[in-house]
Regions:
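Bacterial N-terminal signal peptides
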Residues: 4-14
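N-terminal segment of the mature folded domain
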Residues: 21-144, 148
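Short helix-initiation/N-cap motifs at beta->coil->alpha
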Residues: 44, 68-78, 170-191
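Ligand-binding cleft/hinge of the Venus flytrap
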Residues: 54-59, 132-183
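A ligand-binding cleft/hinge motif common to bilobed small-molecule-binding domains
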Residues: 91-100, 191-219
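Periplasmic-binding protein-like
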Residues: 114-116, 145-147, 209-246, 249-265
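Short helix-loop capping/hinge motifs at secondary-structure junctions, enriched
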Residues: 123-130, 149-151, 168, 237-243
Length: 265
């Protein structure tokens, strides 16, 4: 019996990473990316700034860019067939994408921008939240974004990275006791923030900047700051113009546009 168990364990451990297909991966889908349209797919959030860059580029070149964003399950099948570019809103998110989109590989991933996590509060900051420690007060209602092992989101683990930055367990415990919702995506977190009348949400700068009537950003101090990157992966069989668009996405003009939503290089 012990020998049989050992054989099974050895077989599992020896399986290559490529064999670890995700639930979304569909090997029956055939690819046809070179259709004259540059197609980018990824999580909601970065798309608002990327769209603005794409609009300028399209006006300058006449080349069409189609951007699809949101929960991965809503676009996965289409992306497996025609994605020229996949973007990841954090490294762990991009790594997870590579398990599903087999036409892309890790050596094709390029980090292009960074942004810091922020505390989003209600517009006008009625609770007067000015720093992380204010979130530890009893009764503060906090929303966090967390994939929980079932969703691919850039917010996974960010709240505990911030809470644990100084190596104080009591900070993590106090913060966790104030969490009123763990949501599996930033869009869902924003809805929960409003529905639950929460006081704070650990998120990214683009959300308060894109929703100034509802949200206001409170920056984290440097000793609490957590940064995540925006990375892109270009498919080997991508539309020929896709690389040109990615080059433009990091141009001086594009950097000005991206910076308005908190993205820096």
């Amino acid at each position: 019996m012990r020998i049989a168990v050992l054989i099974v364990l050895t077989t599992v451990l020896a399986m290559p990473a490529s064999a670890q297909d995700t639930a979304l991966h569909d090997p029956s889908i055939s690819r046809d990316a070179q259709d004259g349209v540059i197609r980018l797919y990824g999580a909601g959030g970065p798309d608002t700034a990327i769209r603005k860059v794409a609009d300028v580029w399209t006006k300058e070149t006449g080349r069409k860019v189609e951007i699809t964003a949101g929960p991965e399950k809503t676009w996965s099948k289409k992306a497996q067939g025609d994605a020229d570019v996949i973007w990841g809103a954090s490294e762990q998110a991009m790594t997870a994408f590579l398990e599903t989109y087999k036409g892309f590989s890790s050596d094709q991933v390029e980090p292009i921008y960074l942004r810091p996590a922020v505390i989003a509060v209600k517009a006008g900051n009625p609770k007067g939240i000015m720093k992380f420690e204010d979130l530890l007060a009893e009764g503060t209602k906090i929303v966090v974004t967390e994939g929980a092992g079932v969703a691919n989101t850039s917010g996974t683990g960010v709240w505990e990275d911030i809470a644990g930055r100084l190596g104080r367990l009591e900070d993590v415990a106090a913060f966790r006791s104030n969490i009123v919702a763990f949501e599996q995506g930033s869009g869902a977190s924003f809805k929960a923030f409003k529905a639950l009348d929460a006081d704070a949400w650990i998120t990214w700068p683009n959300w308060p900047l894109s929703n100034p009537d509802t949200l206001e950003a409170v920056p984290l101090s440097s000793d609490r700051a957590i940064w995540r990157d925006l990375s892109v992966a270009l498919a080997p069989d991508a539309d020929p113009d896709a690389k040109a668009f990615l080059d433009y996405l990091i141009s001086d003009e594009a950097q000005k546009i991206m910076s308005r939503e908190g993205w820096v290089r």
